[in-house]
Amino acid sequence: MIRVILCDDHAVVRKGIRDTLTEAVDIEVTGEAASYTEVREVLRHAPCDVMVLDLNLPG
């Protein structure tokens, strides 16, 4: 199982990526974040193998 964290400040983008990824049988979205502050908190509680990261994510 590949564990993924989604990091984007636009909820609609996160939802679209999450909906696409959940169709795969071997991918699990373990967390989501809308800012770098949230990313740090999510990483403490949700392990991941891959992070989908918006490069323009606010602080």
Put a short name on every predicted segment.
Residues 13, 58-59:
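The feature encodes the CheY-like receiver
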Residues 9-12, 38:
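Intrinsically disordered, low-complexity regions enriched in small/polar residues
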Residues 54-55:
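Active-site residues of response regulator receiver
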Residues 32-50:
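Acidic, metal-coordinating helix/loop segments flanking the phosphotransfer/catalytic sites
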Residues 11-31:
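Two-component/phosphorelay signaling modules centered on CheY-like receiver
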Residues 1-3:
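Non-catalytic signal-transmission and effector/linker regions of two-component phosphorelay proteins
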